[in-house]
A protein has these predicted regions:
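Secretory targeting and sorting signals
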Residues: 1-14
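Short N-terminal segments immediately surrounding and downstream of signal-peptide cleavage
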Residues: 14-28
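Buried hydrophobic core positions in alpha-solenoid tandem helical repeats
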Residues: 21, 63-66, 97, 132, ...
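An alpha-helical repeat/solenoid feature that recognizes helix-turn-helix modules
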Residues: 31-57, 68-91, 106-130, 138-174, ...
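Alpha-helical repeat scaffolds
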Residues: 58-66, 90-100
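Extracellular loop and loop/strand-boundary signature of outer-membrane beta-barrel proteins
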Residues: 102-104
Length: 264
């Protein structure tokens, strides 16, 4: 049975988020309905499933088969994180991340890729820690790249990276406060101010706050609950349904209150 047919058949019985995600996997690879499987989505599915203690049979072999096709530092780090969550030691991918580290502490192409690399490596050099701290804006947040507008997702990722780096105190407190400024009256968090709440930004915020040692607002979980659909998936927002496997996988990790990296 093909991937799409298998997903369609299993989806009929899917009633929980875990079952929904599992229904979109075949031989360890995951895909959105009607779309091709890829390493990035498979990694997100693995992270979501492992966060709630579920297995992802065949996914490690699939991800390892895709390593040579990975291009960006962020993709390398994402797959490494997923393989680690499956109990592997992705040394080849970690070596690529270490080789992408510059004297300034930047890893890869951006602030974002640096955060992901730290999560995948499970540690940060002094230079990289200084680099991340130097990129914190006056308001307390981080942006995707140097000089960009700070947003909730990148701030959450930075807080998770600082946790790995062992940073505490004022930078983390300021970051958490900035992150909370993105919460709306509906309980959800938005990517940038005025954009409106969405499930993925809310999931990132929950993970970031947990990484910062803060208790996520109950209203954030209530917002996510309102986005849950009958088939077990989560809407991207109150208005849109898009990339449900990706969205639901991210929500699973948030509901488990587990920041990255996950233990293998």
């Amino acid at each position: 049975m093909g991937l799409v047919a298998a997903a369609a058949t299993a989806l009929v019985l899917a009633v929980t988020p875990v079952q929904f995600v599992q229904a979109h996997g075949s031989n360890g690879a995951f895909a959105e309905t009607g779309g091709p499987a890829d390493a990035a989505l498979t990694s997100w599915a693995v992270l979501g499933l492992r966060a709630v203690g579920r297995l992802a049979p065949g996914s490690l072999a699939y991800l390892q088969s895709q390593e040579g096709l990975l291009q960006s530092t962020t993709d390398v780090a994402l797959v490494a994180l997923a393989e680690q969550a499956l109990g592997a030691q992705p040394e080849t991918l970690r070596a690529r991340l270490r080789s992408a580290t510059r004297p300034s502490g930047l890893i890869g192409e951006s602030v974002n890729s640096t955060c992901w690399a730290v999560l995948a490596l499970g540690q940060a050099s002094r230079a990289t820690t200084r680099y991340l701290l130097a990129q914190q804006a006056k308001g307390g947040g981080w942006s995707w790249a140097v000089g960009g507008q700070p947003d909730s997702n990148d701030t959450a990722a930075a807080l998770e990276a600082l946790r790995v780096a062992g940073v505490h105190g004022a930078p983390v407190t300021r970051g958490a406060k900035f992150l909370l400024s993105f919460q709306n009256r509906d309980g959800g968090f938005e990517l940038t101010h005025g954009r409106g709440s969405d499930a993925q930004s809310t999931a990132w915020a929950i993970q970031g706050l947990v990484a910062a040692g803060r208790k996520p607002p109950r209203s954030a979980f209530a917002y996510l609950a309102k986005l849950k659909r009958a088939d077990g998936s989560y809407r991207y927002s109150a208005r849109y349904v898009t990339t449900p496997v990706w969205v639901t996988s991210q929500v699973l990790a948030a509901l488990a209150k587990k920041p990255f990296p996950l233990a293998g």
